């Protein structure tokens, strides 16, 4: 009874224009009351349309000077806003704003409303239906989405199990590798301590990086599974609850369910990793003795800029990289990129002029797919033609160099054959591990230039013998078209 009286009172203090509780109510001579904003808007419209002012309800004319604030109604509205509804009025099937039963479903807003809500400005023009008419339709949608979610939950749990298994497998594998490294280096402890430490550090970093990534993936998989579980719980709660709970915000829930996409964990294929294998211990001992010997002649090499080379040089004169491709403007506004003089003219000489003695330096070429390095007797300005075919890279022209192209093809450049002396003889080089760091040793008096694969324990890559050094020679670097820099290493690195 009290709830019904309360509803009747609310109807009496509801604005006939906006159908909401009166805000700053104003009364006319006829006794009708309106919100101040609603009456002002109606007054402007009436003046424009007819030139007269009349009550929006009974059409009785009024004078603006007779409009008065209705404080009594304002007090009633204020009390109504403070009054709590009775337990009966607090039922979930009644509108919290108007106290009417929630019998309608608004398609645009995806929620249940009462008949007064339907007539309010908020829902004006929206498509509304009886809740009984749409409940079954949304129940079918939710059920279908729930089945899909359960399948994704199973997939998520399988992914979570797989990542845990892979994490354990990686840990076991790397622990085994560490043990193997320790056993292999024990036989060469006196001269291989630094190599053992380096190898273990690489494995530790590999373990740290991979396990860190896998742990991160595991956390993401756990969060992903939990997210799906929570969404399933929400849907099950709706399906088990009342029609009102089922429909309230149902479109948003369905959209969330349909947008669920399982993220695959990051994996690391074991067949692509670098696996440590101990070389022949006797041969390795000889290699280390040779490398240790030539490293006694390590000189601090930097490059010397010149007007011939297009190479980009760092401020410390240690890094050399390929320039940006030039943009060529063609006919009808077309453009394309090209590397002008990309081979020979990106070469650069070291600043040290060598006329005698033994000299050693190392070049970091990690992550580069193409490079040329070695020793040069100086640029040949008259030999800057046919540069795309490497014609210049021959000992007869003063170049004792090796190079890499396409990331895997390592070659040495020798003099051309008797039948084709202008083209260099390309010597394919067999390297077990592609070098990330190359050591160059020049013995001026012995007329030799040797190249060492520092990445693979310092094994010899290639050696030029019987070199004809008729003039001063210089270290030579060419980054080719690969924009990753090549770096001259300092003796302390």
Curated annotation (Swiss-Prot):
Protein name from the UniProt record: Tripartite motif-containing protein 5
Zinc finger (RING-type): 15-59
PROSITE patterns per record: B302_SPRY (PS50188), ZF_BBOX (PS50119), ZF_RING_1 (PS00518), ZF_RING_2 (PS50089)
Entry PTM: Degraded in a proteasome-independent fashion in the absence of viral infection but in a proteasome-dependent fashion following exposure to restriction sensitive virus. Autoubiquitinated in a RING finger- and UBE2D2-dependent manner. Monoubiquitinated by TRIM21. Deubiquitinated by Yersinia YopJ. Ubiquitination may not lead to proteasomal degradation.
Highest taxon above the source species: Eukaryota
Zinc finger extent (B box-type): 90-132
Pfam families: SPRY, zf-B_box, zf-RING_UBOX
Subcellular location: Cytoplasm; Nucleus
Ligand binding (Zn(2+)): 95, 98, 117, 123
Location of Phosphoserine modifications: 86
Gene Ontology annotations for the cellular component aspect, listed alphabetically: nucleus; P-body
Entry annotated with the keyword Metal-binding: yes
Keyword Chloroplast: no
Pathway: Protein modification; protein ubiquitination
Record-level Gene Ontology MF annotations: pattern recognition receptor activity; ubiquitin-protein transferase activity; zinc ion binding
Chief location bin: cytoplasm
EC numbers: 2.3.2.27
SUPFAM superfamilies: B-box zinc-binding domain (SSF57845), Concanavalin A-like lectins/glucanases (SSF49899), RING/U-box (SSF57850)
């Amino acid at each position: 009874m009290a709830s019904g009286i309360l509803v009747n009172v609310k109807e009496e203090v509801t604005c006939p224009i906006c159908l909401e509780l009166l805000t700053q109510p104003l009364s006319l001579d006829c006794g009708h009351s309106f919100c101040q904003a609603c009456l002002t808007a109606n007054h402007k419209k009436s003046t424009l349309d007819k030139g007269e002012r009349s009550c929006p309800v009974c059409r009785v004319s009024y004078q603006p000077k007779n409009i008065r604030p209705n404080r009594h109604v304002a007090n009633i509205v204020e009390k109504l806003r403070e009054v709590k509804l009775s337990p009966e009025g607090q039922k979930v099937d009644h509108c919290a704003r108007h106290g009417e039963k929630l019998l309608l479903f608004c398609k645009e807003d995806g929620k249940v409303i009462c008949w007064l809500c339907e007539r309010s400005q908020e829902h004006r023009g929206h498509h509304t239906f009886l809740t009984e008419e749409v409940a079954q339709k949304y129940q079918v949608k939710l059920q279908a989405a729930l089945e899909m979610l359960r399948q994704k939950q199973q997939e998520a749990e399988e992914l979570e199990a797989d990542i845990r298994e892979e994490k354990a497998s990686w840990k076991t594998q790397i622990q085994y590798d560490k043990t193997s490294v320790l056993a292999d280096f024990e036989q060469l402890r006196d001269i291989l301590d630094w190599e053992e430490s380096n190898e273990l550090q690489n494995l530790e970093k590999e373990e740290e990086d991979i396990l860190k990534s896998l742990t991160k993936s595991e956390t993401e998989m756990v969060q992903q599974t939990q997210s799906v579980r929570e969404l399933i719980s929400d849907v099950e709660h709706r399906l088990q609850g009342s029609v009102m709970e089922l429909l309230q915000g149902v479109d948003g829930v369905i959209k969330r369910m349909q947008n669920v996409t399982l993220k695959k964990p990051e994996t690391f294929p074991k067949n692509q990793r670098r696996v440590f294998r101990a070389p022949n211990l006797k041969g390795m001992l000889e290699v280390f003795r040779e490398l240790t010997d030539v490293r006694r002649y390590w000189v601090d090499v930097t490059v010397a800029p010149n007007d011939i080379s297009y190479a980009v040089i760092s401020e410390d004169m240690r890094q050399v990289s390929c320039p940006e491709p030039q943009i060529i403007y063609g006919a009808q506004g077309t453009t394309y990129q090209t590397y002008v003089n990309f081979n020979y003219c990106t070469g650069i000489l070291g600043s040290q002029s060598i006329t005698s003695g033994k000299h050693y330096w190392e070049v970091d070429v990690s992550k580069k797919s193409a490079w040329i390095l070695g020793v040069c007797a100086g640029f040949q300005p008259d030999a800057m033609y046919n540069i795309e075919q490497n014609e210049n890279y021959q000992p007869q022209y003063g170049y004792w160099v090796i190079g890499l192209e396409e990331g895997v093809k390592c070659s040495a450049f020798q003099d051309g054959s008797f039948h084709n002396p202008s083209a260099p003889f390309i010597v394919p080089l067999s390297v077990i591990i592609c070098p990330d760091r190359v050591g160059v040793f020049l013995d001026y008096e012995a007329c030799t230039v040797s190249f060492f694969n520092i990445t693979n324990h310092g094994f010899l890559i290639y050696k030029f013998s019987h070199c004809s050094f008729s003039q001063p020679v210089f270290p030579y670097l060419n980054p080719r078209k690969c924009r990753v820099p090549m770096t001259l290493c300092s003796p302390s690195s």
